[in-house]
C-alpha cells in the first residue's frame, strides 16, 4: 500500500505551498543518491519526488485529497504518469535543490522587481552637425533610482522580507473543486515582498521623478530618421528592477542650400547665360565649409546636372562620402544696359545658323498641323 504523500514529506494536510516546498528541499537534500550512501536512498528519493509531484500542483492535490491514490491509478495504467519523480521539470527541481544545497544557482525573481519603461526623445539637428557628428546635451524628466534607499524601497538599514502569504510570487491560489483561481496577494499587493518601513523619499517605490541631463553622441554621417539606443538610460525599474532604454530619434532640419538624398547632396546652382554659353569655372560652397571650383562646360543648358565627387555627406563608420550634384539654373537678365543690348543685337545678326534654326523650327510646326 502506498504511503500517504503528506506523511512522506512530513507536512500536514493544511500545509501551504511554501511549507511543502521547504519540506521537499530538505528531504531531497538528505536522500539524494549523490549526497548519501544509505541503501534505501534511491527509493526514498523517488517517494519524495512522487509526493512533491502531486502536492505542488493544486489541481492534483485537490484530486488526491478527495480520492487518494486512486485518483492517479487510471492515469498510470494508461502510461500517462510516472511517479519516479524524474519525468518533468528536472531543471526546476534541481535548480532549487542545488541553490539551497550549494549556496548558488538560479532563483525566480519576485514580481516586486519591475523593469523601467523605455523612453523616446526627438532630437532635431542641423545638416552640418549630421555631417561632422556632434555631442548634444539633452534634458528630460524621468523616474530615477532612489539614492536614499538604493532602489530597495525600504528605509535605510531596514530589511525587505518575502511575503509569507504568497511565498514571494505576488499571487495566491484558491482551490474550487478541480479548478484553481489565481488572485493578487492582498497582503503584499502583488509585490511579493513586504516593506515594513517604506523609504520616505520614494515612498517605497525605489525611484522618484527627476529632471535629467544627458550627453548624447551623434556620429558623423547620421541619416534623417536614425534611431540611437542608449541602453539603461530609460526610466529606473521599480524596487531594484532593471532600467529601461532611451531611444533618440534623429531629425535633420531642412537646409537653405542642400537637399539630402541618402549620402548625396543636391543643390541648385544659378549661373549667368554668359557662363552657360562660354563655360568657365565658378566657386560653389561645400558642406564641410569653404568653397571649391566647379568647371562649367561651354554650352551648358538650363537643368543640366554637374557632379562633384566625394563632396556629399559622410557615412557612418566609413571614410567614403557621397557626391554633391549641382542642378544648373541659367539666369537671363531682365534689365540690360544700352551697351549689352547692342552687343546682343550684334550677336543675333552674326548667328550663322539663326535662319536655319528658325526655318527648321517653323517647318516642324507646319508638319504637325498638315
From Swiss-Prot:
Segments forming domain J: 4-68
Signal peptide: none
Top-level taxonomic group: Bacteria
Binding site for Zn(2+) 1: 146, 149, 199, 202
InterPro entries the UniProt entry points to: DnaJ (IPR012724), DnaJ_C (IPR002939), DnaJ_domain (IPR001623), DnaJ_domain_CS (IPR018253), HSP40/DnaJ_pept-bd (IPR008971), HSP_DnaJ_Cys-rich_dom (IPR001305), HSP_DnaJ_Cys-rich_dom_sf (IPR036410), J_dom_sf (IPR036869)
One Gene Ontology cellular component annotation held by this UniProt entry: cytoplasm
Cytoplasm found in the keyword field: yes
Binding site for Zn(2+) 2: 163, 166, 185, 188
Any one biological process term the GO annotation gives: DNA replication
Name by which UniProt lists this protein: Chaperone protein DnaJ
Organism: Rickettsia typhi (strain ATCC VR-144 / Wilmington)
Amino acid at each position: 500500500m502506498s504511503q500517504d504523500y503528506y506523511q512522506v514529506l512530513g507536512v500536514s494536510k493544511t500545509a501551504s505551498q511554501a511549507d511543502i516546498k521547504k519540506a521537499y528541499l530538505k528531504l531531497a537534500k538528505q536522500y539524494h543518491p549523490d549526497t548519501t550512501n544509505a541503501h534505501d536512498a534511491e527509493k526514498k528519493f523517488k517517494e519524495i519526488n512522487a509526493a512533491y509531484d502531486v502536492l505542488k500542483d493544486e489541481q492534483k492535490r485537490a484530486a488526491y485529497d478527495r480520492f487518494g491514490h486512486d485518483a492517479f491509478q487510471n492515469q498510470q495504467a494508461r502510461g500517462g504518469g510516472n511517479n519516479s519523480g524524474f519525468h518533468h521539470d528536472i531543471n526546476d527541481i534541481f535548480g532549487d535543490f542545488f541553490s539551497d544545497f550549494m549556496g548558488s544557482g538560479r532563483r525566480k525573481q519576485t514580481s516586486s522587481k519591475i523593469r523601467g519603461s523605455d523612453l523616446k526623445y526627438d532630437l532635431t539637428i542641423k545638416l552640418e552637425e549630421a555631417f561632422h557628428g556632434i555631442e548634444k546635451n539633452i534634458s528630460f524628466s524621468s523616474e530615477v533610482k532612489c539614492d536614499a534607499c538604493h532602489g530597495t524601497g525600504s528605509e535605510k538599514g531596514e530589511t525587505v522580507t518575502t511575503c509569507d502569504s504568497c511565498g514571494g510570487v505576488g499571487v495566491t491560489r484558491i482551490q474550487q473543486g478541480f479548478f484553481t483561481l489565481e488572485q493578487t496577494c492582498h497582503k503584499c499587493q502583488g509585490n511579493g515582498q513586504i516593506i515594513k518601513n517604506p523609504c520616505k523619499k520614494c515612498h517605497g517605490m525605489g525611484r522618484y521623478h527627476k529632471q535629467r541631463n544627458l550627453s548624447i553622441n551623434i556620429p558623423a554621417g547620421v541619416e534623417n530618421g536614425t534611431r540611437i539606443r542608449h541602453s539603461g538610460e530609460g526610466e529606473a525599474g521599480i524596487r531594484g528592477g532593471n532600467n529601461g532604454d532611451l531611444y533618440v530619434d534623429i531629425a535633420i532640419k531642412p537646409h537653405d542650400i542642400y537637399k539630402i538624398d541618402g549620402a548625396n547632396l543636391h543643390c541648385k546652382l544659378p549661373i549667368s547665360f554668359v557662363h552657360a554659353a562660354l563655360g568657365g569655372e565658378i566657386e560653389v560652397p561645400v558642406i564641410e565649409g569653404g568653397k571649391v571650383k566647379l568647371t562649367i562646360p561651354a554650352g551648358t543648358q538650363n537643368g543640366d546636372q554637374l557632379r562633384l565627387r566625394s563632396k556629399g555627406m559622410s557615412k557612418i563608420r566609413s571614410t567614403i562620402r557621397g557626391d554633391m550634384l549641382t542642378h544648373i539654373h541659367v539666369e537671363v537678365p531682365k534689365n540690360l544696359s544700352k551697351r549689352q543690348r547692342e552687343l546682343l543685337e550684334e550677336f543675333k545678326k552674326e548667328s550663322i545658323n539663326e535662319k536655319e534654326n528658325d526655318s527648321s523650327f517653323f517647318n516642324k510646326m507646319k508638319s504637325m498641323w498638315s
